[in-house]
Design a protein with these regions (language model features):
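Beta1-alpha1 glycine-rich phosphate/pyrophosphate-binding loop at the start
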Residues: 2-15, 32-40, 44-128, 237-238, ...
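C-terminal, flexible cofactor-proximal segment of oxidoreductases
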Residues: 4-19, 219, 242-245, 254, ...
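Rossmann-like dinucleotide-binding core of oxidoreductases
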Residues: 27-34, 38-39, 44, 48-70, ...
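Glycine/threonine-rich phosphate-binding loop and adjacent beta-strand/alpha-helix elements that clamp
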Residues: 71, 368, 372-440
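Catalytic cores of eukaryotic secretory-pathway lumenal/extracellular enzymes that build
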Residues: 85-105, 135-137, 173, 178, ...
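Short beta-strand to alpha-helix junction loop
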Residues: 99-117, 129, 213, 283-292, ...
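Feature captures the FAD/FMN-dependent oxidoreductase FAD-binding
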Residues: 103-174, 350
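C-terminal catalytic lobe of FAD-dependent flavoproteins
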Residues: 287, 295-354, 358-384, 459-522
Length: 522
């Protein structure tokens, strides 16, 4: 069974996964420190995991390893102007710590403060070890433990941990590098080129001409934020994205908070937003033409009949083939109407000394060019995974219940939804991890491992979006099956029933004791 020591809990550890090269030499010998559960990553998912572990598995020792020097994950990394959530905070926030602000669409600083405040309020901070970059994890069926190797600090000091259960909460973004296409003539440009993922603190753009390359969530966030200080901001896009305006405050939530206790008002608002989001997504899939017409009608209402909506705001794909872009309080459209910002739909021929030459022959002069061209994905944070000496490739694995890899024992992954707030699924995953750990203890099992009993069944990519960052990573992403529990459902109600209330044991989950092989050939 999984070990635990309620009398002498081990201080939590916070570490992150490898962000750079994946072929570093193994750390030198070091005394391994054992924990019942090792969590990797201290963003939204990691803090959520810490809360559920200490609440539902109070006798277990756990630690959180964080590769960076601060709590917050994505929300500590991204510092570009206007950074904000495109999900409401009643669902992006935790169920156990209600969001109190009237603004439901929060800026990055408010979200970061919320995550830090949660870690402090529930004593999760003391379980975090910063500057721990995880390189590899090796499972031994003989001991029923993972051995996790990491480096610490700028000197890369070796550190080793063992754990009975490994929970990866590091997301799927590559923190080290964003996606940057190579354009001809970039070296000729006399201005400054920046990527939003690594925003320079010294960038001055007051009164300057700015071109933002891209049309996704980052680009539509940057345009209105930078337009407040720049002389003019142009969003250059190769093709349009669906853009939906929404108030940053939730009037229904405000009404409920005036009439109900705070916790009850939060739950009601959370469920209202969950159900409305599911309804809109399902309507988009079943009646895409209807949803498309309503979205474009909203854009025309913002920009007027003379604006070329067809060229600049009408995508060639259906709603939710890619994520929709949310603009709070119509800020993007207000910037365009004011003349401080504009949208150009074209392709880059080359950089020039003064800006960009487009395929159409048009030139865009710029002092600053921002490449909001997307993210790169990194599965399991780039760490190496081994089971009984065999290298495991997540791209060859299937997702079990959307949160575990096939044939990898005592390992779970916190993943969010592509069509709803990340935290909704991450919190359900943490709930299930705790249920699984407690079940193994009750039954005397040392390990569990998802096993596909019908390998010939259909397979599909685990992420079905057509977004560029997903398509670029198609060769590294795990797979999903066509039937449960191997089907990844982008549906909160379905996952709620499966992960919080469903059976832990099924025909696709194997259990065993230490000394019995958990590897696929065992």
């Amino acid at each position: 069974m999984l070990s635990g020591n309620a009398k002498h809990p081990h201080p939590d550890v916070h570490a992150g996964t490898a962000a750079g090269r994946q072929d570093e030499p193994a750390p030198g010998p070091a005394a391994a420190q054992h924990l019942d559960v090792l969590v990797v990553g201290a963003g939204l998912s990691g803090i959520c995991a810490g809360y559920h572990l200490q609440t539902s598995c109070p006798g277990k020792t756990y630690a959180i390893l964080e590769g960076r020097d601060a709590i917050g994950g994505t929300w500590d990394l991204f510092r570009y102007p206007g950074v904000r959530s495109d999900s409401d905070m009643y669902t992006l926030g935790f169920s156990f710590r209600p969001w109190r602000s009237e603004k439901s669409i929060a800026d990055g600083d408010a979200i970061l403060e919320y995550i830090r405040g949660t870690a402090k309020e529930f004593g999760i901070e003391r379980h975090i070890r910063f500057g721990h970059r995880v390189l590899r994890a090796s499972w031994s069926s003989e001991t029923a433990r993972w051995t996790v190797d990491a480096t610490v600090g700028p000197q890369g000091t070796p550190a080793r941990f063992t754990c009975s259960f490994l929970y990866l909460c590091s997301g799927y973004y590559d923190y080290a590098d964003g996606y940057m296409p190579g354009w001809p003539g970039m070296e000729r440009f006399n201005g400054r080129v920046v990527h939003p993922q690594h925003w320079p603190a010294d960038l001055a753009y007051d009164g300057k001409r700015v071109v933002v390359i891209g049309s996704g969530a980052t680009a539509v966030t940057l345009l209105p934020a930078m337009a407040q200080r720049a002389a003019h901001v142009t969003m250059l896009q190769r093709s349009p994205t669906y853009v939906v305006a929404r108030p940053s405050s939730d009037p229904v939530s405000a009404w409920l908070q005036r009439r109900l206790p705070a916790s009850m008002a939060h739950r009601a608002t959370r469920w209202k937003n969950v159900l409305l989001g599911m309804y809109f997504y399902n309507l988009s899939r079943k009646k895409p033409d209807l949803v498309k017409s309503k979205i474009l009608k909203g854009v025309r209402a913002q920009l007027g009949p003379d604006y070329d909506i067809d060229k600049h705001f009408t995508p060639s794909y259906k709603p939710w083939d890619q994520r929709l872009c949310l603009v709070p309080d119509s800020d993007l459209f207000k910037s365009i109407r004011s003349g401080k910002a504009s949208v150009v739909t074209d392709q880059i021929e080359s950089f020039t000394e003064t800006g960009l030459l487009l395929r159409s022959g048009e030139r865009l002069d710029a002092d600053v060019i921002v490449t909001a061209t997307g993210l790169q994905l990194k599965v399991a944070g780039g760490m190496k995974l081994e089971v009984d000496g065999t290298r495991m490739n997540p791209a060859q694995a299937f997702m079990y219940k959307g949160m575990m890899y096939s044939d990898m024992p005592n390992l779970a992954v916190a993943m969010g939804y592509v069509n709803a707030s990340w935290t909704l699924k991450a919190e359900l995953s943490s709930t299930y991890v705790c249920r699984l750990i407690n079940h193994m203890d009750a039954k005397g099992h040392a390990w569990c491992a998802p096993r596909r009993t019908d390998p010939a069944s259909d397979e599909e990519p685990s992420l079905s979006l057509r977004s560029g960052y997903v398509q670029r990573a198609s060769n590294i992403l795990p797979k999903q099956g066509s039937r449960r529990p191997w089907k990844v459902h982008q549906n909160y109600l379905f996952d709620l029933m499966a992960l919080k209330f469903g059976k832990v044991e099924d025909s696709e989950m194997a259990f065993g004791r230490a000394g019995t092989a958990a590897s696929v050939d065992g």
